[in-house]
Amino acid sequence: MATVTTLSRAAGGRGNPSNKPYLVEVEIDLAAAATAKGSALAANDVIEAITVGANTVVMFAGAEITTAPSGGTGASFDLGITGGDVDAFVDGMTLTGASAGTYGTLANTATPILVTTSDTIDMLLLGTTPDTAGKVRVYACLMDVDSVGSSKEADEVARDYLA
């Protein structure tokens, strides 16, 4: 089993990531993942897709096939948090034979997950022979739940001393 880390993208994205929900996405190229690994992808390989910071709630996450996968036999994947629930968001999405535009069905247990220490949303490859080509868009709606700061007293910023 191998973990491919070079395709992971730091949390950020559209919207205002200051204690408001925001969307993060990354496109996983299966051929690039194999190149980054240094050998063919195999069952039980983990592809880290999205880095999630500490004290962040993953409100939901999902996957969409953007380029039809090929070169595999009976391949599928789970989407979740490998150190926790590996199929928290998508359970057994088919890769082999899937068409572009196919979305993974959210797992019945897909509920918000609080990530208290930095972690990643991962694809866990399943099946006989994972596909060697194709692209999958992984997306997540995140929200920082860290403290918004202090008491907001007037002495917090230098400009307040100028008056």
Label each region the model flagged.
Residues 2-163:
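Surface-exposed, low-hydrophobicity beta-strand/loop segments enriched in small/polar/acidic residues
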